[in-house]
A protein has these predicted regions:
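Sec-dependent N-terminal signal peptides of Gram-positive bacterial secreted proteins and lipoproteins
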Residues: 5-27
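Subset-of-secretome marker
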Residues: 27-283
Length: 283
């Protein structure tokens, strides 16, 4: 159960980062790429709807597993994310469906999450939790908090190449700045209390954006290493995968949460379980 909670914490952190960090386009060292990025950035800012499919292979190791007699464990996380009204936080809706398979686990771990009408709903592993979330405030707070980050400091090693009719921009995200950035975003979003992220470290982040002839970002590829240290034990992860954007610019219908009354309020849930377990079991 403890290791599984760790996995869920990772998934929650990744999901939070994915949902809270909009795909931003950054300036490039070369004039060609800078011009291309300018176009992509304008398109991204105007995007109101998104239907994305993520597929990541994850290799997990570290002393926590070694103590259990396991050298490493392979996982695969597949996600579908649907969002609309992205430029209007008051109206915004999103839905995430994630399916995780791992060595030694016969059943996949399924998670679905929804945001609608100021509430965030999570349904996973037999638990249904809801919490109020003010996306307008989070968006503003995140914007303000991340103003101090200089894009030139955050990204480096730009390359530009062709792939069929598409163009690809590759770049590296600076480790220290990214760790700072994630802490800042999660803190601004009020999510740092949910998960203790002090022991989180992300490194060797390599990214590629695939841009179609119309200037749409149609795929993002990412490799990274991540470790979480908690109570003196470390779990390490190597991730490699991509996020594809289906029909960029087209309207997306986002499913609504079914039976919202069946979800328990996060505060009540944490109160009950913290007393029982002596620690936060969720995420």
């Amino acid at each position: 159960g403890y290791a599984m909670r760790k996995m869920k914490r990772f998934a929650a952190v990744l999901l939070s980062a994915a949902l809270l960090c909009p795909m931003t386009a950054y300036a490039d060292n070369s004039d060609d790429a800078r011009a291309l990025y300018h176009q992509v950035e304008e398109k991204q800012k105007a995007l109101t709807d998104m239907n994305a499919f993520a597929d990541f292979k994850i290799s997990v190791g570290g002393d926590m597993l070694e103590e259990a007699g396991i050298d490493s464990m392979n996982m695969r996380m597949e996600m579908n994310m649907k969002m609309n009204h992205m430029t209007d936080p008051q109206q915004m809706k999103y839905m995430v469906y994630a399916r995780t398979t791992m060595d030694g686990l016969q059943e996949p771990v399924i998670m679905s999450a929804y945001y609608q009408d100021g509430w965030y709903y999570v349904d996973t592993m037999g638990q249904k939790i809801k919490m109020p979330m003010d996306v307008s405030a989070i968006t503003e707070q995140t914007k303000v908090s991340t103003l101090t980050f200089d894009e030139d400091d955050l990204l480096s090693n730009f390359r530009l190449w062709g792939e069929g009719e598409n163009k690809v921009v590759g770049f590296v995200i600076e480790d220290d700045k990214m760790n700072e950035y994630i802490q800042t975003v999660l803190s601004a979003a009020g999510m740092s209390g949910l998960t203790d992220l002090s022991g989180l470290d992300i490194s060797d982040i390599q990214c590629e954006y695939v841009v179609d002839p119309a200037g749409n970002c149609v795929k993002m590829r990412m490799k990274l290493d991540m470790s979480v240290t908690d109570q003196g034990q470390t779990v390490t992860m190597k991730m490699d995968g991509d996020i594809g954007i289906a029909d960029p610019g087209q309207p997306v219908e986002v499913p609504s949460v079914q039976d919202p009354a069946s979800y328990q309020d996060m505060a009540a849930y944490l109160g009950e379980n913290t007393q029982a377990a002596g620690q936060q079991p969720f995420l």
